[in-house]
Design a protein with these regions (language model features):
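Short functional micro-motifs and their immediate structural scaffolds
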Residues: 81, 98
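Short loop/turn motifs enriched for small/polar and acidic residues
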Residues: 32-36, 65-69, 108-110
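Long, charge-rich boundary regions
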Residues: 106-121
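Cys/His-enriched microdomains
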Residues: 71, 88, 105
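Flanking scaffold residues of small Cys/His-coordinated metal-binding clusters
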Residues: 67-68, 84-85, 102
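Internal catalytic or translocation cores that form aromatic/hydrophobic pockets or channels
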Residues: 60-62, 71, 80
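Short cysteine-rich clusters marking metal-coordination/redox-active sites
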Residues: 73-76, 90-93
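Long, charged N-terminal interaction/targeting segments
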Residues: 1-59
Length: 121
């Protein structure tokens, strides 16, 4: 379960940013998770509950936004629906598709106790 190491990294990054801004605690961590990652959302949420203990994020809420996978043909530019079509090559020209979105994880922002200001990480 690699979600625990990812959750620990998320907490460490959020905590470092919060400390840099003089925060005493973190209330919210907003995450964008690509649907084409190998990360299981429920496992990540469970791992976050463990990873946040005894940190500035001890009482933080994790909000996960799922980013849909978007693919595009680098040759002809066609953007098919990868979930509906379940394809690895362009339906128009047959060349391989390149993934444009939905295969990464991004810590979008955190909210901390200092004046309830949210800032990007």
């Amino acid at each position: 379960m690699h979600e625990i190491s990812i959750a620990i990294s998320i907490v460490e990054i959020a905590e470092a940013s919060a400390r840099k801004h003089g925060a005493r605690s973190i209330q919210l961590v907003k995450l964008r998770l690509g649907e084409f990652t190998t990360i299981v959302q429920e496992a990540l949420e469970f791992a976050f509950e463990i990873a946040r203990q005894d940190t500035l994020a001890a009482h933080a809420t994790l909000v996960v936004e799922i980013v849909p996978m978007v693919v595009r043909c680098s040759s002809c530019g066609v953007i098919p629906n990868p979930v509906r079509d379940i394809i690895l090559s362009c339906p128009q020209c047959g060349l391989p598709l390149e993934i444009m979105a939905g295969e990464d994880i991004q810590l979008e922002y955190i909210e901390a106790e200092t004046e309830n200001i949210a800032w990007s990480v």
